[in-house]
From Swiss-Prot:
Gene: rap-1
TM spans (from-to): none
InterPro entries recorded: P-loop_NTPase (IPR027417), Rap1 (IPR038851), Small_GTP-bd (IPR005225), Small_GTPase (IPR001806), Small_GTPase_Ras-type (IPR020849)
SUPFAM superfamilies documented for this protein: P-loop containing nucleoside triphosphate hydrolases (SSF52540)
Family to which this protein belongs: Belongs to the small GTPase superfamily. Ras family.
NCBIfam families the UniProt entry points to: small_GTP (TIGR00231)
Protein name: Ras-related protein Rap-1
Organism per entry: Caenorhabditis elegans
Length: 188
């Protein structure tokens, strides 16, 4: 079974942990408890293929910056999360993406831009069009999500698996060859 390393990145309080825990455990975490680093594993089926996702839920971008390069180096795919209720979290994404590209030393990195908390429409300050435009500029996918309302949560991770499969196709293996292959995704 192919493994995928996904890293979730973004500013503090945007809902990185809420998205990850909702996807992995089906639970919405109400209480904000800043993350240092948590790792989750979940087996899923994407397009008829069994996949093992290793998801690294990271600290907010303003914390533990020394560890971030290591996450980026090891990740195969990245979820860049902002809150639609906080403009500053959206503004942080450009630097975050630039750092990923610098560490990976390539412009072609599986990545999805995620506007979280779309259930809080009354508190929206970042328009959906802004997210779509930035994703277009990045050449990445874009989704608005709500961990609380379970909107587009699984789709984020499935889309990233598909991107990783396109970017790093599994070479045909003869019987008896090792089945171990690892791919990484980072969610910011």
């Amino acid at each position: 079974m192919r493994e995928y390393k996904i890293v979730v990145l973004g500013s503090g309080g945007v809902g990185k942990s809420a998205l990850t825990v909702q996807f992995v455990q089906g639970i919405f975490v109400e209480k904000y408890d800043p993350t240092i680093e948590d790792s989750y594993r979940k087996q899923v089926e994407v397009d008829g293929q069994q996949c093992m996702l290793e998801i690294l839920d990271t600290a907010g971008t303003e914390q533990f910056t020394a560890m971030r390069d290591l996450y980026m180096k090891n990740g195969q795919g990245f979820v860049l999360v902002y809150s639609i209720t906080a403009q500053s979290t959206f503004n942080d994404l450009m630097d975050l993406r630039d750092q990923i590209l610098r560490v990976k030393d390539t412009d072609e990195v599986p990545m999805i831009l995620v506007g979280n908390k779309c259930d809080l429409e009354d508190e929206r300050v970042v328009g959906k069009d802004q997210g779509q435009n930035l994703a277009r500029q990045f050449g990445s996918a874009f989704l608005e999500t709500s961990a609380k309302a379970k909107i587009n949560v699984s789709e984020v991770f499935y889309d990233l698996v598909r991107q990783i499969n396109r970017r790093y196709p599994e070479s045909g293996r003869r019987q008896g060859q090792s089945n171990k292959q690892c791919c990484s995704c980072v969610i910011m």
